[in-house]
Amino acid sequence: MDELDIYKRQGFAQTVGLGRSPALVIVDFVVSFTDPAHFGGGNILAAIDNTTHLLAFAREVGWPVAHTRVVYADDGSDAGVFARKAPGLLKLTEHSPLSQIVSALSPKPGELVVRKQQASAFFGTGFATWLTGRGADTLVVAGCTTSGCVRATVVDSVAHNLRTIVPTDCVGDRALAPHQANLFDMGQKYADLMTGPELMAACKAL
């Protein structure tokens, strides 16, 4: 018996499917994650490019759209253990060019921008309330990194009882091994996995 057989025997990787009211969150596709000298690398640039198509679709069909940024005070007074573990995060202040959402995915009026100090889009923010106010029952999570802020957001999405979808070509990581391992684990326990084109086709079929 291989490891995948164990997951199958234990009943993981069931399909939850799309609900009637999806929303899209794009996690931390900011300038610093496009540059390997800061937080970039791996397949992040490809994921950004793929996400432009998903974002255009979401806008066309009228999904609520949210974007996240990690933003700390200029003096680091709101930083905690997360920033001690990765001190480079302290460069991500409100007006730093590094913390700005990439131009290809710039928010439009009416789209939420979540400023956060932790990995999850939900922790210490009003994101859950915003989703509830818009009647969302499904959350599509794109962004980076797959093993970090995407995963944390996915786990908290399920904790808020939302159907959760990860478009696999719209998430990225600075290294492929954690990207692949975390996609596997999220697919087993938390999210339905599909590509962006597969997701858009599934939505059109509803």
Predicted regions and their residues:
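A short glycine-rich beta-strand->turn/loop micro-motif centered on a GG-aromatic cluster
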Residues: V140-G143, N161-L176
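Glycine-centered short loops/turns at secondary-structure junctions
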Residues: E60-W63, G135, N161
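Short glycine/serine/threonine-rich phosphate/pyrophosphate-binding segments
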Residues: T146-T153
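A charged, well-structured terminal subsegment
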Residues: Y190-L206
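Internal catalytic-core helix/loop-beta-alpha segment
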Residues: H95-C144
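Active-site-proximal loop->helix
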Residues: R174-G187
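Active-site acidic carboxylates
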Residues: M1-K108, L112, C203-L206
